[in-house]
Amino acid sequence: MKRTFQPSTIKRARTHGFRARMATKNGRAVLSRRRAKGRARLAV
């Protein structure tokens, strides 16, 4: 059985990156929640 986690920086950024979050209304909600919580890193 192959390992399921095959890291790729590009895929990571495209699905969980800042610009990906900003692209949708819900993504912006995620960022605002993380800002409110005081996260050092908002997105990947």
Swiss-Prot record:
Q: Identify the gene encoding this protein.
A: rpmH
Protein name, UniProt field: Large ribosomal subunit protein bL34
Please verify whether the record's keywords include Ribosomal protein: yes
- Alphabetical list of InterPro entries matching this protein: Ribosomal_bL34, Ribosomal_bL34_CS
Q: Which UniProt keywords apply?
A: Ribonucleoprotein, Ribosomal protein
Would I find Ribonucleoprotein among this entry's keywords? yes
Output one GO BP term.
translation
Pfam families named in the record? Ribosomal_L34 (PF00468)
Q: Which family does it belong to?
A: Belongs to the bacterial ribosomal protein bL34 family.
Q: Which GO terms describe its molecular function?
A: structural constituent of ribosome
A GO cellular component term found in this entry reads: ribonucleoprotein complex
Under the heading HAMAP family, the entry gives:
Ribosomal_bL34
Task: Give the lineage.
Answer: Bacteria, Pseudomonadati, Pseudomonadota, Gammaproteobacteria, Pseudomonadales
